[in-house]
């Protein structure tokens, strides 16, 4: 039996609408949010996901300060936690500690129950927010997995299992890519360009997000303007603009403008625009505590906002990044995945992650302009997002960071 495991990770964020948010939360508390308060399993893992997100981001930022960054910490962590169910020894410890979990402070059962609740919440039907996540387990038809591993990934991570003919690599590649394309509504195609010949198992995670802003920009107001990629490079981008009430303030600690935009439903995007020359300071200074404080304490001001339309993507081979976070053994010949199968020693030969982010003017109602047109308060700020900035998208019910990124060039795919 071939002795390697090929692991593919996938994410999609399709953010099709952008607009100013509202300070007030939805007036009526839904049954879903009540259940989340009563069963806060995902809340226990949320701080660790946030720390993992920033650690992962900083590794990517150190690798290059001239390219866009976009990934889903939830997607990556879910796949790693699911894989950990079949690992033992140092391989097992490295994965969970790499995800910022302290096994002396949190029971492993609580970790997996947290992910179980997270996935249940993300996949709950919502008429206002399209948010779905899926885990696929593609198993060579000749490979016998241990019953406990198969039962756990299905019950805790809602994973689908597919019998796959990995001896025909092209057929297997197409099967996996079709699963991903369907799950991401056609936004990500051909995730796997090739498949190793000794692959016997593939773990695939995807997430699809499409949100509408509570109050959209007016498309007729969008104009071509300069975006300063760096001191020497300027590109022309469609720049949206709007006069209205925004959750916007300047944070002296981060030397950055902080803008929060609410989606219809239960998600918020935080955009961090550093002062000129302060991107490295922002990246080194921002913490999960600061971001949480922003979400809890929001001020509303009348402002003129200019924001670029964005269409970017990120594709990553995760080996190098995860190795920098201490997750190394699972990729080596010393990997212990004996909890997956007893038939042969396995190692992870491939770890892929892809994310796509689209932002434009669209919203649910054009009436937002009328409401904002009646605001008579004094204009306080004029802020132009015409240079690189960070973005973090949170899901409120689980208190988890769905996506993290840096927009260096809004037009660069």
Curated annotation (Swiss-Prot):
Protein name as annotated: Alpha-1-antitrypsin-like protein CM55-SI
* The species this protein was found in: Tamias sibiricus
The answer to whether keyword Glycoprotein applies is yes
Q: Which residues form a coiled coil?
A: none
Q: Where Pyrrolidone carboxylic acid occurs along the chain? A: 25
Q: Which superkingdom does the taxonomy of this entry point to? A: Eukaryota
Q: Which Gene3D superfamilies match?
A: Alpha-1-antitrypsin, domain 1, Antithrombin, subunit I, domain 2, Serpins superfamily
What keywords are annotated for this sequence in UniProt? Answer: Glycoprotein, Protease inhibitor, Pyrrolidone carboxylic acid, Serine protease inhibitor, Signal
The UniProt comment on domains reads:
The reactive center loop (RCL) extends out from the body of the protein and directs binding to the target protease. The protease cleaves the serpin at the reactive site within the RCL, establishing a covalent linkage between the serpin reactive site and the active site of the protease. The resulting inactive serpin-protease complex is highly stable.
Molecular function per GO: serine-type endopeptidase inhibitor activity
């Amino acid at each position: 039996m071939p002795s390697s495991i090929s692991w593919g990770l996938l994410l999609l964020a399709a953010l099709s609408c952008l607009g100013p948010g509202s300070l007030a939360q939805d007036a009526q508390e839904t049954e879903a949010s009540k259940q989340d308060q009563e069963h806060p399993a995902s809340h226990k893992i949320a701080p660790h996901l946030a720390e993992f997100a920033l650690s992962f981001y900083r590794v990517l930022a150190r690798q290059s300060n001239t390219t866009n960054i976009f990934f889903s910490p939830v997607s990556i962590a879910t796949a790693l936690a699911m894989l950990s169910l079949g690992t033992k020894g140092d391989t097992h410890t490295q994965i969970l500690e790499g995800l910022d979990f302290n096994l002396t402070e949190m029971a492993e059962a609580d970790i997996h129950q947290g992910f179980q609740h997270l996935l249940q919440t993300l996949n709950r039907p919502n008429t206002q927010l399209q948010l779905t996540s899926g885990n696929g387990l593609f198993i060579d038809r000749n490979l016998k997995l241990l019953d406990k591993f198969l039962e756990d990934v299905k019950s805790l991570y809602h994973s689908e299992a597919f019998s796959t003919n990995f001896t025909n690599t092209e057929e297997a590649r197409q099967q996996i890519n079709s699963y991903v394309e369907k799950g991401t509504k056609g936004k990500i195609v051909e995730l796997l360009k090739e498949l190793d010949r000794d692959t016997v198992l593939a773990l695939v995670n995807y997430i699809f997000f499409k949100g509408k802003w509570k109050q959209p920009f007016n498309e007729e107001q969008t104009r071509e303007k300069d975006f300063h990629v760096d001191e020497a490079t300027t590109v022309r981008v469609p720049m949206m603009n709007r006069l209205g009430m925004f959750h916007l303030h300047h944070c002296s600690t981060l030397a950055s403008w902080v803008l929060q935009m609410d989606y219809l439903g239960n998600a918020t995007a935080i955009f961090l625009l550093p002062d000129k020359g302060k991107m490295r300071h922002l990246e080194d200074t921002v913490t999960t505590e600061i971001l949480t404080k922003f979400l809890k304490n929001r001020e509303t001001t009348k402002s003129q906002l200019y924001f670029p339309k964005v269409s970017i993507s990120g594709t990553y081979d995760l080996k190098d990044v995860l190795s920098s976070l201490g997750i190394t053994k699972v990729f080596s010949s010393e990997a212990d995945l004996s909890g997956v199968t007893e038939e042969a020693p396995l190692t992870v030969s491939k770890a892929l992650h892809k994310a796509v982010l689209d932002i434009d003017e669209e919203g649910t109602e054009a009436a937002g302009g009328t409401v904002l047109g009646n605001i008579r308060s004094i204009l306080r700020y004029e802020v132009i997002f015409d240079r690189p900035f960070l973005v973090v998208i949170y899901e409120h019910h689980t208190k988890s960071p769905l996506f993290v990124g840096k927009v260096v060039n809004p037009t660069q795919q």
